[in-house]
């Protein structure tokens, strides 16, 4: 049995090797990733995922070869990105990118490599999170859910924070998130939100002004956006 320390050490070596080989993937697609007994032992029978965002164009330039190399390295699952709502295809966020892949082609290449698409990061292009725009967000998630169901994903994740200036904004965003969760749930897909750091900014109630507190040690006024999300979103959706 591989102990935890040995497993983490071997995975670290594998990760460093993967980073170093990114350029090799594009410049020399026939070169194989060196396999070691340590890596095989560390990953045998375990699931190990990769965000394809970390490879970007390097992977898109030769998907079949790149996916096969990931499988040989011990990866089993992928979290993809680059969903385009206008075409329903997948690419990356580089405006110069001209490579876009249809969902059925993406799935075939992943299946052929013996991998699985477990999750996807995607964000609506519409940035005005208002009550009036809720139907538009519903349409985005309905179309995206249909396409991602074809890929067999178990989770869809929004990784970006909409603009939130006050508590009312956070409540509207939370409701849009709830509706998105209801839509994906009908297809057997979990909906999630990937927070960063801006969610830990405090916001006031609409119309409320910040107080000038002479005590520098006094806690700032307002509620964390993250706290408002937790309070106003439904974990069952």
Residues of each region from the PLM?
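Extracytoplasmic/secreted envelope proteins and their assembly/folding machinery
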Residues: 67, 170, 174-177, 223-227
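Alpha-helix termination/capping residues and helix-transition junctions
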Residues: 72, 114, 150, 232-235
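C-terminal segment of N-terminal export signals and the immediately downstream linker at the start
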Residues: 23-61, 69
């Amino acid at each position: 049995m591989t102990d935890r320390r040995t497993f983490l050490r071997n995975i670290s070596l594998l990760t460093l090797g993967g980073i170093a080989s990114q350029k090799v993937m594009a410049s020399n697609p026939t070169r194989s990733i060196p396999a070691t007994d340590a890596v095989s032992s560390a990953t045998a029978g375990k699931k190990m995922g990769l965000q394809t965002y970390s490879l970007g164009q390097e992977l898109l330039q030769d998907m079949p070869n790149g996916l096969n190399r990931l499988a040989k390295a011990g990866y089993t699952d992928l979290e993809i990105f680059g969903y385009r709502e206008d075409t329903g295809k997948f690419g990356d966020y580089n405006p110069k990118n001209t490579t876009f892949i249809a969902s059925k082609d993406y799935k075939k290449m992943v299946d052929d490599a013996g991998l699985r698409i477990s999750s996807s990061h995607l964000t609506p292009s519409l940035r005005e999170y208002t009550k009036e725009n809720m139907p538009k967000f519903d349409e985005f998630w309905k179309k995206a859910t249909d396409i991602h169901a074809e890929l067999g994903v178990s989770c869809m994740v929004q990784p970006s924070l909409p603009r939130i200036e006050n508590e009312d904004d956070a409540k509207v965003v939370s409701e849009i998130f709830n509706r998105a969760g209801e839509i994906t749930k009908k297809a057997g897909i979990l909906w999630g939100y990937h927070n960063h750091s801006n969610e830990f900014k405090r916001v006031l109630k609409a119309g409320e002004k910040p107080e000038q507190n002479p005590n520098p040690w006094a806690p700032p006024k307002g509620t964390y956006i993250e706290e408002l999300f937790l309070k106003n979103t439904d974990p069952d959706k």
